[in-house]
Amino acid sequence: MTETKYSAVIIAKNDESTIGECILAMQKLTNDILIVLDDRSDDNTENICLQHGVRLIKKTWEGYSGNKNFGADHGKNDWILCPDADEVFDDVLIQKLKEINPKDDQVYEMNRLTYFMKTAVKHSGWFPDWNIRLYNKKSMRWNDNLVHESLESTYPLRRQRLSGIVRHYSFRDENHMKEKYDIYAKLRANEWIKANKRPSIFKMWFGPYFRFVRTFILKLGFLDGKTGYTIAKNDFILKRKEIYYWRQFPKSASNVQ
C-alpha cells in the first residue's frame, strides 16, 4: 500500500460495463473508494459497486463538477484520485502512484488512451491526452463548467506527469458515441447561454467542416483508418448539434439534466 493515503472518488451513472474494472484498479491504491452514483442510474452499477465493498452515495445530479466536489468533500483523505467510471489505471501507473510522495503545490497528470469499441485510438487528437487524476482537495476544486469541467486553484500549482496509461473505455460502439455526443452538444449550448455568448458566424457556418479536417487530417485521424473517419464524422455532427441546440434552446435556464 502506498505511503501517501489516497481517496478515490468516482462519479457514475449506468456504468455497469466498466465500473468493476475501475474499482479493482483503485483497490490496489486505497481502501477509501467512494462512488457518487447519479440517482437516475437504472442498470446494475449499484450492485456491482456494493459487491466490491466500496462506499456508495446515491445523489441527485448537480452536474459533473457539483458531484465531483461533493465526492471529494466526503473523501477521508486530502489526496483525491479521480478516475472516470470508464477509466482503468494500468499497472505501471499504479506502481508509480505507490512510489511518489505528492507535493502540496503540485497536481498530477496521467496519460489517457481512449478505446473506440476495442480499438486503441492513437491519433485523431485523442492521444496523448494528459488529464489531472490526482489532486489535493485542500488546494483545488472543480469549476462549474457544464462540459469539460476542470480543476481550479486560488494559487499557481505545478503540473507533474506520471508514467503509465489510463485506459479509457469511452465508447462501446458508434451509437453509444452519438448518444454521448448529443449530451455534450446540449451541455455546450447551455454553457454558451449561461455565459451569454453567441457563436461567431465563422463557427456557425464553418466550424463543423474545420473540426472534421482538424480531426481527420491535421490530427492524423486517417492513420486510425475507419475508426479515424468515424471519429471525424461524429466530430462534424457534434459541432453542428452544438449550433442547433444553441438556436433551439431558450436563452435562459439550463435545458439539460
Give names to the regions the model predicted:
Residues 1-25, 255-256:
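N-proximal low-complexity "stem/linker" segments adjacent to membrane-targeting elements
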Residues 66-72, 79, 83, 90-255:
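Catalytic-site signature of metal-activated, phosphate-bearing donor transferases
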Residues 59, 83-85:
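Catalytic metal- and UDP-sugar-binding loop of GT-A-like glycosyltransferases, i.e.
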Residues 20, 41-52, 92-93:
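Acidic helix N-cap motif at the loop->helix transition within catalytic regions
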Residues 16, 25, 29, 35-47, ...:
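A conserved acidic beta->alpha catalytic loop
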